[in-house]
């Protein structure tokens, strides 16, 4: 897999790999691949039935965790907004300047809540578009 990992420090690699592991353990419906997310190249992309669900990317200025669950479910979005202090929250992604800013326990809880959300309307929407 040719990903952004090669650009990271040892600590950053360990944390990103821990996040990757949690994503596939907590949400067993997703499959990981390397791809592009918007203008970011060589990202980790997680799809559910061929539909983008999550992504991990690195830009020049920050890391991002992208989430279609967060985008489509107000309660999931509300959870991360209310429980984050060092994260920059957007509609469908969480930006963090370094890996210490997104505590792994918060990430795990966020994924656990996300996995329980009904993603089928999003899957059905994108399958109809194909």
What is the predicted role of each segment?
Residues 1-130:
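Charge-dense, helix-prone N-terminal extensions
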